[in-house]
Each structure stands twice: as structure tokens, then as C-alpha cells.
UniProtKB/Swiss-Prot annotation:
Note describing how the cofactor binds: Binds 1 zinc or iron ion per subunit.
Family designation: Belongs to the metallo-dependent hydrolases superfamily. HutI family.
Gene from which this protein is expressed: hutI
Organism: Salmonella paratyphi B (strain ATCC BAA-1250 / SPB7)
Cellular component aspect of the GO annotation: cytoplasm
UniProt protein name: Imidazolonepropionase
Length: 407
């Protein structure tokens, strides 16, 4: 009989989808095991016959499925306002250029966010965060990017820090100051990039407000030369980088980000084979964002087969934002990744667990059920992991465990 220490907690009578690639079964499935949690981490996974059947800290899950906590590795969670009216305009035939000329588009969100009080932004973001937590998310990336000026970018990152301080969910904050050119720099995007590189990145990094730097390398964002200035600045300070790349056109952004050993290249609908090879060589994760693909009614799909052939890890994320992916649901993103992009359900699960952890640099502690990893996991009223992907309108979450505590 296995000896338990005071304070140990056990989940028994479970079906474990460990998402551990070292296990041969699909999803890393293993039956008739028990999970021992000690001080917020998984202490061990052992045959349940080695443990007592009952006790003060022994939870009998009656055969339910247990998976790692979900990880949403790409969100724009902190913003004010919404863009529902301009979505209706687009459906009625208005062009993006027409909407932008009326003050719509990303600058509408920037204006609303700049004007919004920090406490209000926090309350808005907290409600969104708890929606994701209710789906089993235990680690969440939050980008800035709706300030496009030092004061508001800092405000957004402070909100992310306040959310993290609640200890309800892990937050990985990302500085996305190079998201778009603000209206006041419309005729001087290079000048804005200078502000980002010489002021925003160093000052906000010194304050410890973010973990990584992101950028939007695209025909409607920043060109390759401007994007490289951002990457050079970040890497000179030892800051991990990532990028929104190849969403609407092929500019070579994935190759650029991979050359700087980027954590991830996100969107990647127009990614080519050279970009895929560069991602493999740079250790860069491909992050698929099917919500934006759906909402923008795009037709160019990411090269999933090439990513498989080159063995590039593929993550899946919600991309929750008010303009192009207003879907605060990782379950829905998993389903869309399968239906629209051709991922298998097992690939979708890897995309919101171990590959999403790698996209955030957390692969040594998150995204799998293994001894030594964080005790972040979800108990589901389900028999198979595919059920969560198959029916995104139903949430079979039974219990969410964060840092070893039922939450």
C-alpha cells in the first residue's frame, strides 16, 4: 500500500487522458490509476490498487475522465466596447475601408479602451476570464495592443497583473504594442515603431509587466523591416518573442519570427513550406486561430499537412477579441480547428494542452499530467476526450482543479 503524507490529496477511480506523448495510447490515456497531488503539483500517478479506497483527502470520481487544464495561448482579453455594429455593416456590404474611414476598425476599440477606467477594464476582463475558466482553462495568455500608447498599454498590462493576483487562473501577459499604427501616427508608422522599441518595450519590461513581445507582421499591420526592429529590441533585452504572421498574405513573417527563435507564429493561413521549415528549425509553435478564419469568412486554410510532415507542434487558441474573433470559448475553437482546418480531435487536444504550453514557454510545468507538473486538471462528465470537441455547445465540466485546489 502506498504511504500518503499529511496534506496529500488523491483523485481515484478516474480515466486519465495525460496528453503525455511518452504514453503509447491515444491522448496518453490510462485507466485504473490514481492521481496524487502534493503542494500544488502532481506527486505521482499510481495504480489505484496501491491506495486506500477512502479517506479524508481521497476523491472518488466514479470513472470520470480527467485531462490537463486547458490552455488558451492567444487572447486579446482586455478591451472596452464592441464592434457589433460594424460587423452588421460588413454583412450589409460595407467595406473595411469605409468602416475605417468612419472611425471603425481597430482604432474604434483603441479609442474606447483609452477612455475606459482601469477598474472597468478589469471587471470586463474578469468576466471573460471566468467564462474561460468555466470551460476548464487554467492558463491564459493575455495580450495588450488596444492602447497603442505607453500609458494605455501599461494600463492593460496592469489589468492582466491584477487578474493574475486573484490566483484563479495563471496569466501569461504579452506586450502587443506593435499591433497597429495609431491614428496619431497614421503618416509615420516608422515613428511609432521607434516609440515601441525605444520607450514601450524597455520601460514596461523593467516594470515586470509582461513575459513576451508580440507583433502584427501583415500588409495591414507592419512590414518585415518594421517587425524586425521590434524583434531585435526584444531579443537584445532577453525577451521571448512571437508574432501574428501570414494571416492575410505571405510576407515571410513566420521565417522572420523563427529566425529569432520565436515561441510561436500565429494565424499562418498563408504559410508556405519555407516558413514551415523555418519554424521547425527555430523551435517555433504554429498557433491556429479558427475563430478569426470563420468570422472573417476567409478561404485560405493553414497548411496543416505541411506542419505535420515537418513535425511542427500545432496549438489552437480562441483569439478572443472584439474585431475578428468574438468567441470566448476554447471548446468552440477546438471544434472549429477540426471542422475547418482538418485537425484530428487528438491534435486539437494537444493544441490546447502540451503544444499550447510550449507556445507560452511553459512546457516543463504545464499541459500534461505527469509527476512534477502543476496540478492543474479538469474532471469531466465524459468517457472520451473527443466528446468535449464534438459538442461545443455543451460543457460537461464536473470539477476544475487549479494548483491542486478544487476551484
Amino acid at each position: 500500500m502506498r504511504q500518503l503524507l499529511p496534506g496529500d490529496t488523491v483523485w481515484r477511480n478516474i480515466r486519465l487522458a495525460t496528453m503525455d506523448p511518452q504514453r503509447q495510447a491515444p491522448y496518453g490515456l490510462v485507466d485504473n490509476q490514481a492521481l496524487i497531488v502534493r503542494e500544488g503539483h502532481i506527486c505521482d500517478i499510481v495504480p489505484e490498487t496501491q491506495l486506500p479506497v477512502s479517506g479524508d483527502n481521497i476523491h472518488d470520481m466514479q470513472g470520470r475522465l480527467v485531462t490537463p487544464g486547458l490552455i488558451d495561448c492567444h487572447t486579446h482579453l482586455v478591451f472596452a466596447g464592441n464592434r457589433a455594429a460594424e460587423w452588421e455593416q460588413r454583412l450589409n456590404g460595407a467595406s473595411y475601408q469605409h468602416i475605417s474611414a468612419q472611425g471603425g476598425g481597430i482604432n474604434a476599440t483603441v479609442s474606447a479602451t483609452r477612455a475606459c477606467a482601469e477598474e472597468t477594464l478589469y471587471l470586463l476582463a474578469r468576466e471573460r476570464m471566468m467564462r474561460l475558466a468555466s470551460e476548464g482553462v487554467t492558463l491564459l495568455e493575455i495580450k495588450s495592443g488596444y492602447g497603442l500608447e505607453l500609458a494605455t498599454e501599461e494600463k492593460l498590462l496592469r489589468v492582466a497583473a491584477k487578474l493574475a493576483s486573484e490566483n484563479a487562473i495563471d496569466i501569461s501577459p504579452t506586450l502587443l504594442a506593435a499591433h497597429a499604427t495609431p491614428a496619431e501616427y497614421r503618416d509615420d508608422p516608422d515613428g511609432y515603431i521607434t516609440l515601441v522599441c525605444e520607450t514601450m518595450i524597455p520601460q514596461l519590461w523593467q516594470k515586470g509587466l509582461f513575459d513576451a513581445v508580440d507583433l502584427f507582421c501583415e500588409s495591414v499591420g507592419f512590414n518585415v523591416a518594421q517587425s524586425e526592429r521590434v524583434l531585435q529590441t526584444a531579443k537584445a533585452l532577453g525577451i521571448p518573442v512571437k508574432g501574428h504572421v501570414e494571416q492575410l498574405s505571405l510576407l515571410g513573417g513566420a521565417q522572420l519570427v523563427s529566425r529569432y527563435q520565436g515561441l510561436s507564429a500565429d494565424h499562418i493561413e498563408y504559410l508556405d513550406e519555407a516558413g514551415v521549415a523555418a519554424m521547425r528549425d527555430g523551435g517555433t509553435v504554429g498557433v491556429l486561430l479558427p475563430g478569426a478564419f470563420y468570422f472573417l469568412r476567409e478561404t485560405q486554410r493553414p497548411p496543416v499537412e505541411l506542419l505535420r510532415r515537418y513535425q511542427v507542434p500545432v496549438a489552437v487558441a480562441s483569439d478572443f477579441n472584439p474585431g475578428t474573433s468574438p468567441f470566448c470559448s476554447l471548446h468552440l475553437a477546438m471544434n472549429m480547428a477540426c471542422v475547418q482546418f482538418g485537425l484530428t480531435p487528438e491534435e486539437a487536444w494537444a493544441g490546447v494542452t502540451r503544444h499550447a504550453a510550449r507556445a507560452l514557454g511553459r512546457q516543463a510545468t504545464h499541459g500534461q499530467l505527469r509527476a512534477g507538473y502543476r496540478a492543474d486538471f479538469v474532471v469531466w462528465d465524459a468517457e472520451q476526450p473527443v466528446e468535449i470537441v464534438y459538442e461545443p455547445g455543451r460543457n460537461p465540466l464536473y470539477q476544475r482543479v487549479y494548483r491542486g485546489q478544487i476551484s
